[in-house]
Amino acid sequence: MTPTLRRKLEALAERREELQHLLSDPDVVNNNDKFRTLSRELSQLEPVAVALEDEARAKADLSAAEAMRTDPEMRELAEEEIAAAQARLEELDTQLASLLVPRDPRDDGNLFLEVRAGTGGDEAAIFAGDLFRMYARYAERQGWKVEIESDSPGEHGGYKEVVARVVGRGAYSRLKFESGTHRVQRVPATESQGRIHTSAATVAIIPEADDVEEIVINPADLKVDTFRSSGAGGQHVNKTESAIRITHVPSGVVVECQTERSQHANRDKAMKRLKAQLLDTEHSKAAAAQAQTRKLQVGSGDRSQRIRTYSFPQGRITDHRVEGLTLYDLPNIIEGDLDALIARLLHEHQADELARLSDSP
């Protein structure tokens, strides 16, 4: 571990001691909001404290074993204990470094998943449907809930566009690196000559805005349209203009919702998505600026970036943001088995963040 990272760990340990003193202050105890905020911060620092205590014990074990090595009768046992202590210290070094990576406060929250067909006509819509099902099945494995907010089916299957809300603890932390252009290479069912076609779909992962996050939306900047829904709700949806489309004129962002029976409920859902999109745009600009400065790929927030190719003839998936990230497990991945892929992306992002921390004073 670099001296810079070690100093940051020491600062966190000092902050933990400071928080413990603050939380015993009667003024803080009697202030519910402040007590809750400081308690949350302290709980986030506990894993660092535990790892530092484990590291101190491992260093003491190593010193004791090295001292024991001078005794010829104990040398063999000492060598074993030295090896075990060194292995434990290496493990703790990695663990402590990972604990330094700043936690995205949005990680535990829900998200909006948007999948749109790109170039490739009917095959692009079918691929967009495949991607949506892949994420829906992954969500099901995690015990998350998927609620379709709006969709536009393709003429021969799949979706021209589908928007869903994914509800579950940690959903955003697992799927936030999926935004971008996804490309597929395969022989379409309608292709009589057996030729491989290439088509694409875009994915956007937008964290649901927390109620604490403030963003001012001027009602005068909104254009609100109503239309007859084609979604859930039985015959009622086709008789009344309950569906809502909201355009934020300054940014050009358009959201719509047609899944609820009442216009009021659809408007509430649409406004939540609009708020989430506008906040995400701000976060994405900051992430893109940082990525440009450090030449990062994972987590750059660029949705126009081609991030992945799905080659069905070869049964492989290649993620273009991480050198050497090719998995020959396409059949399982497209069925929602994303754990190995997501783990590699999270590891790469963590490495980028640690490099940034090492460079900072």
UniProtKB/Swiss-Prot annotation:
Chief localization: cytoplasm
GO cellular component: cytoplasm
UniProtKB keywords: Cytoplasm, Methylation, Protein biosynthesis
Matches recorded under Pfam families: PCRF (PF03462), RF-1 (PF00472)
Residues bearing the modification N5-methylglutamine: Q235
Leader sequence segment: none
Keyword Glycosyltransferase belongs to the record: no
Location(s) in or outside the cell: Cytoplasm
Keyword RNA-binding belongs to the record: no
Molecular-function GO terms, alphabetical: translation release factor activity, codon specific
Mod. after translation: Methylated by PrmC. Methylation increases the termination efficiency of RF1.
Record HAMAP family: Rel_fac_1
Function text: Peptide chain release factor 1 directs the termination of translation in response to the peptide chain termination codons UAG and UAA.
Sequence similarity: Belongs to the prokaryotic/mitochondrial release factor family.
This protein's name: Peptide chain release factor 1
Organism field: Xanthomonas oryzae pv. oryzae (strain KACC10331 / KXO85)
Gene field: prfA
